[in-house]
Amino acid sequence: MSPFLSFSRATWSELRNSVPMTLSEEDLKALQGINENLTMQEAVEVYLPLSRLLNLYVQARQSRNSVLHQFLNNDEHAPPFVIGIAGSVAVGKSTTARVLCALLSRWENHPKVELVTTDGFLYPKKELDQRGIMHKKGFPESYDMKKLVQFVSDVKAGKPELEVPVYSHITYDITEEVKKVDRPDVLIIEGLNVLQSGMDYPHDPHRVFVSDFLDFSIYVDAESNTIEQWYVERFLKFRKGAFTQPGSYFSHYTQLSEQQAIEKAQQIWRDINGINLTENILPTKERAQLILRKGPNHLVEEILLRK
């Protein structure tokens, strides 16, 4: 018997329960990724019911905190509700994270919602080169996990004015910018490996993971060959957009012909992203509390919710 309840898109959309849509078409356009076509229908039928579910979870957590405050006779700031969103490169998890961030921030009982991507915790390019793992960017070993876990731990401890490094997809490196995170009501952490746990490292049983701090977890899923196709399509769009910007690490790819670019993207997928998906990301899927399963057209077709 499956540990998940399965919902068709139509059945799931009914769980919206008349919650009003608070985002406009313009809002959605600003939130979607380069290779996504996020429609109002998708937002209403998939993400609005999900925001309602998450709101109920947050409310339950806030009620529990108020009991604790009553018992301790204090009004200390409650720790944030932390949501993790995982999935492959090019599957659309960043768009999912941005849409949920926007929707959740419009609920009156938790208006302060922050979104942090784990990209900011990648080792700088120089260090990846020194370690000889530049070709493994995105793999667990390419992240400063100690720094990432410390950040999430500090957020949960209620520490104010935390700083998160900012990553640039143009320079392919950590920048000098920082993002401030100051005791949000809800924190969304989006990244490839946020659902990894001690089960992935049996030789190191005392290690602490981001997943240890999550209150709710989402995995954005699709067939591997479908994601590969999306990756190639995204690569071709970047080739005509982001790769042409001054200082772009990938500017040399703009000189490739269309066919050469397709072959290069397929090679990168085959040698890096596909392996990372199979070895490190996909094994964490079953740990998620909710799985959004997408079809070839980028639309969510099935929702799996842990019982």
Swiss-Prot record:
Q: What is its EC number?
A: 2.7.1.33
Question: Where does this protein reside within or beyond the cell?
Answer: Cytoplasm
Q: Does the keyword Ion transport apply?
A: no
Which GO cellular component terms are attached? cytoplasm
On whether Transcription is a keyword of this UniProt record, the answer is no
Write down the PANTHER family for this protein, in alphabetical order. URIDINE KINASE (PTHR10285)
What protein is this chain from?
Answer: Pantothenate kinase
Organism per entry: Vibrio vulnificus (strain CMCP6)
